[in-house]
Each structure stands twice: as structure tokens, then as C-alpha cells.
Amino acid sequence: MSTTLHREEVFTSPTAIFQGPASMESKHPGLRWVLVHTGNDIAYGLVYVAGDLLRRDHKILWIDGEDDVEKNVKKITKFAPQYICYGPLSTEFLQALKLSKAIKKELPLVNNVFGGHHVKAIPEELKNEDSIDYLVWGPVYGSIDKIIESPLNTLIEGAPTKPSNMQPALREYYEQIPRMGQRERKYIMSHFGCVYNCSFCCTDVTRKAFGPKVYKEFWLERRPIENMIEEAKLLLEFDTKEVSFEDDDVLYGTHEGGDATEWLREFKDVWKKEINLPMYAN
């Protein structure tokens, strides 16, 4: 006698027990993934998802969630993906969910994958959304193969990786979402954590889940300067007039004797020499 499991029984809550950094090996290359841009801000998180997918030898296609649904369905149908990835901000979540339902209606065999801070903050509340096939809690790293290997209605837990392993795939994004490529101000980040505990932010969720030691080691460590310069050189190929330094706290660790003091001094000099675009910082 078979047993039918309800979605809330299949989706399980995240444990976030740190079991080591994410594996950067790929066991299932060659699949097709669509990434959905929503809203008017640069989807800086999703471009790292794109980077991880390309590094694992998958094919990607960007679509603009602001475009007509019929137009997007045609593009998706032609590309024939196995998965569609959404990483909306909380303010864009309902829009992304509406789009996922419309796509699911036309293409029921395509798997919708939702991740990002909104999922991280309220995974329990999203279990019963029928248009969502996979929820990804935490970083993308280590999650791609898990998505491919897991049954539907699974909550996937990602794992952190060192910033030196993290590089966004911006060219495809700016070319395929031209209204973002044409923006005069682009984003860049040197680390992905925050030392504060604002009540409206999910930073505290991540820090508590993984622990302060792991959080500092992976989220607060600076990216290699050469990686950031490589990223910024691509910005020069597009219509970029200025760059926003989007770290939650650019000056973290730059007090006298701090770990990042020398890093920031060196970054400033290299940026001036090789990029020389105005920067704005948080």
C-alpha cells in the first residue's frame, strides 16, 4: 500500500549544521537552467548562482520577469530547461511567485527553484506553494547537485565556500537583461556578511544557524582583490559611470590594526590604477 506524502511532510526545516565547506566538484554537468531577474535592482546574488552553474558546465539563460509572460514562456520553451531559478528580494517575492505559477501552468514539467534571503527568513511559510518545487536555504554552493539528485518538494541546504571560489557571471546577465547592463551605476562586493543585528534583516538568522566562527570565516572574509578587479574590468565594457560598493559595512575590520586595513589600502591603489571609476560605499 503506497502512502501519499503532503508537501509539508516532505519539506523539512533547515538544520544548518556546518559539515564543512561546499564541494566545488560537479557530478551532473550539462543541464539547462533559466535564471529570472525581477525588480529594478541588479540581481547580484543570482549572478553568483549563474557563476556557479557555468563553473559546473551547465547552460544558462536569463529572462526578465518584467517582460510579458507569454514572451518569457516562448523563450523558456525554446531553451528547454530542466530548472528555473528565482532569488527575489522580499519586495519582489509575490511578483516572482506569480510568474512561477504562470510558467508552471504552461510548462508543468519544468522545476521552479526558489532561494535567497526571503526563503532563508521564512522557509516554513513557503512549503505549501504549489508552484515551488525546491527551496534552497543558505548559499548556492553545494546545492546544485543536491537539487538534481533530490525528489520534488525538497528543502535544499547550501554550504558556504571561501570568497576566493566565488565569482559572478556578469557578462551573460548584462547582455541578456540589457536594462541592467545599461545602468550607469553597477554593484560590487568584497564580502557578504555583516557584524550588526538589525531586527529587519536576516543576517542574524544566518549567523545563528552556522555559528559566529563559521560566519566570520566565510561571510566576513574579503574577496581576493584580483577577483574584484577582474569583475570590474567587465563593467568597463558596459555603460558604467560609477560603482556602488554594496558591502553592508565596507569599513569592517579597517580600524587601526584591523585585518582589512591593508586590504582596503591595496584595493584603493589597484582600483585607481586599473579601473578608475568613482565609487560609493555603505
Regions found by a protein language model. Give the residues of each.
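Radical SAM [4Fe-4S] cluster-binding motif and immediate context
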Residues: 171-282
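N-terminal [4Fe-4S]-dependent radical SAM core
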Residues: 3-29, 149-191
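Conserved alpha-helical elements of sugar-nucleotide-dependent glycosyltransferases
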Residues: 41-48, 227, 263
